[in-house]
Amino acid sequence: MKLAIDSGFPNSHAFVTLLKKEYGMLPKEYRREQKKEKQQTSQQLEQHNYIAGLKKYLNDNTHTHVVSPISKKQIDFSVNGSSYVLLHTWKKMMTVGRASDVLICDIQEMLTRFQNRIGFEYIKLCGIFSDDLHVYNEKANGTPVYSFTYIDKILDFVTKLHLNPWIQLSYMPEKLAKYPNKRLFGSNVSQPHSIAAWCRLVSEFLQHISNRYGLEVIRSWKFGLWNQPNTNMDLFGFSNEKDFFQFYKETFLCVKNFCPDIEFSLPPTYYIVSEGYENWYLNFLEWCKQNDCIPDSLSFTYYDTKLISNKNHSKESFGFIYAMSLSESPDGLKDFVMQVLRERRRLNLGKLPIYLSEWNNTPSQQDLLNDTCFKSCYIVKNILENYDRLESFTYQALTDLMADSSLPNMLFFGGLGLFTVNGIPKASYYAYTLLQQLGDQFLGRGDEYFITRENDSFQVMLYNYRHFNYLYANGERFDMTETDRYTVFADSEPVMISLCLSDIPQGNYKISETYVNRTHGSAFDQWVSMGALELTTPQEIDWLKKSSVPGFHQKIVSVNSDEILELDVTLELLEVRLIQITPLH
């Protein structure tokens, strides 16, 4: 009664009536709900109903046709400036998630298609010692039993695709684990109960693949250890930092004693993962210097997120929870790249290779923007802005079909992949097919454009990137729905670009434009236009695959004696467009 009167209600009955109307429950039930701990996991951001409740007060504009204003941009560029050869390091390495995923037939088909289209050099394979590959067992008397049959099948398949394995020595077979119940994503992530037993496993594995493929071949492969050791013990970290340092050193020596020429990388470090772990890899490298085990390369995991540990977690439990928010900055990856390059100089590591062995804007398998044109534009923007600055940019992941967690029973659930679970290419896949067509000579870049040359032809990549709003970055979907996912972009206007290229030799040219936007190349948007029903037959899936390809347009233009080529292009929100300019002889 006191709460009702203090809040301005005439009596408790009026208070209870309004509360039940607004929240659908009585005060006692409401208090019970409020006591439940609301936590966020790294797989899905919490949504706050009080924000969504404001939606009913918005004006209904469903019958109002809103014409988006068009911003204008002028690009003036001479193709006769200085140039240099591109390495295309974004094609250095790809990944499928866990090594065991390569055994899945559907994933093999997607992997084959992607590799045939792009031509990567390496594939990262993590979890090769996980129990699902049955690598390690023991007899009743404790004698170790090794089996590399499933690993052989994985390595045979990827090498037939002309992919060199990048082998991450992980995770821990349960029989070797100090903490048998310390599991994450289906694998044991404990430190070993015996480093000597672990090193025997590594040695047996190295000897096996050397016998099978030849030492000269595996010298061209790359090796690393573990995954994100700078996270808390409740994730991939060890109970004591020094325990991991020693684990690394003994594994490093084991590999180098077998073959000094094998490249052994820094354990993939989750960059600035959480409070208290920002300087982990700097401390680790200093320790390596003092202990003569400096890695041959650096390796990082990067997501445009901030992870904040839950201070109320139990140290006895391995179910550690992180709160997560997305970066509000559109330039997070660029800032990260420049920072690690500065730190490499400061540590006097020379030109020690830096591999981005896993990256995305989110680690979430249920972020609805993953299926949209946002992700294709995000990929293009970040690769072009950071082109060749690191030795690899390994996008996570190939497909939504990832075996480390259960998957929602729907087609577009916000998975990380370039392909849906049934092999439908998303807009993000086609971003890579456009990048693949860039030339080998870099001419220049600027505000949302990138220009290359290949022999007598020129390639111009344009994009209209917009970052999501503050609310979405902090977990509020607000008025986003399963089918309307672009409401989180405050600025949705198209941009009209006037492109003026000078010093183009006189003559006739074929202009070929390939573009990915909401009407071309986006399977999600095509699915929405089809009615957004679940696809129930192979024919429907095949139709969606064939109908959601990039747009394409060609025309012939003439360049006069002034050697100027002018083109006008309009890009929709989050559109990516490749313009190829080819002389006609």
Language model region names:
Residues 175-176, 180, 223-231, 274, ...:
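Active-site-proximal loop/short-helix segments
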Residues 95-99, 128, 170-172, 226-228, ...:
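Active-site beta-loop-alpha junctions enriched in small/polar residues
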Residues 12, 97-109, 143-148, 176, ...:
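Acidic-and-aromatic substrate-binding clefts and catalytic sites of carbohydrate-active enzymes
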Residues 413-418:
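Short beta-alpha connecting loops at secondary-structure transitions
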Residues 14, 33-168, 175, 179, ...:
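Non-catalytic accessory regions flanking glycosidase/transglycosidase catalytic cores in CAZymes
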Residues 241-385, 389, 411:
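Noncatalytic carbohydrate-binding groove/subsite architecture in carbohydrate-active enzymes
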Residues 131-135, 174-182, 231-234, 305-316, ...:
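Short acidic/His/Gly/Ser-rich catalytic and metal-binding motifs that mark active-site loops
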Residues 1-33, 53, 58-60:
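Sequence-specific DNA-binding recognition helix
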